[in-house]
């Protein structure tokens, strides 16, 4: 490779070869594990990072426009058809150079960086929606990413964040979601839990998930509202939904459990609720 020169890739991509890990063109990808890469912190860089071919493809299909791509020869070649017309530079480097830039070895071999874009309101993301996931206190990025992946695969139309939730665009959340955090519409409630009342006034039935023994069993509760617009409320692992959220909900629902187990991982519980919704007749469309 010749450092800093543009080269014609055998598959037709115009790439810029980089051999120096200190090259300032790669600053958007530098030290990805550093605390200042946390975009949810006051001093954090507010960039969205996609890792791996599939997640980069989903970024390219989303509202997030890449500033640059950085990858190995092999992985950039896999993206050849997706990159037509993308007005961003492609930086090519060895796996060794990539590791020195980002701070760890990346098996997936390619990254894309994008700026954040303005977020829609709750009213905008739920307009026309039939099934909405409402999260409160879900502060683990991996759980959040898994919920987005489950939502995408099980026909959830939008996600609404209440208080105390993690950042859906943090790198780990985007990676675990397989890029679906970039595609599934979401919004943050400006006034919590008052926004739950707004959902009710918009015609949604609020089903609050809780392990309490006096709650309705999930399959029966979902079946009873199969023709209605529903919002599935999911709380933090451990404390669950707050008393205020439970009070506003229309129905409290629980997953029937066995062997003395009182609850499941929050992403697993959400997936079961989403699946019950599809099983009750809510349409599963073609995958992304």
From Swiss-Prot:
Source domain of life: Bacteria
InterPro entries, per database record: Alpha/beta_knot_MTases (IPR029028), Ribosomal_eL30-like_sf (IPR029064), rRNA_Methyltransferase (IPR051259), SpoU_MeTrfase (IPR001537), tRNA_m1G_MTases_N (IPR029026)
Enzyme class: transferase
Protein name as catalogued: Uncharacterized tRNA/rRNA methyltransferase Mb0905
Phylogenetic placement of the source organism: Bacteria, Bacillati, Actinomycetota, Actinomycetes, Mycobacteriales
UniProt entry tagged with the keyword Cytoplasm: no
E.C. numbers: 2.1.1.-
Annotated family: Belongs to the class IV-like SAM-binding methyltransferase superfamily. RNA methyltransferase TrmH family.
GO terms assigned for molecular function: RNA binding; RNA methyltransferase activity
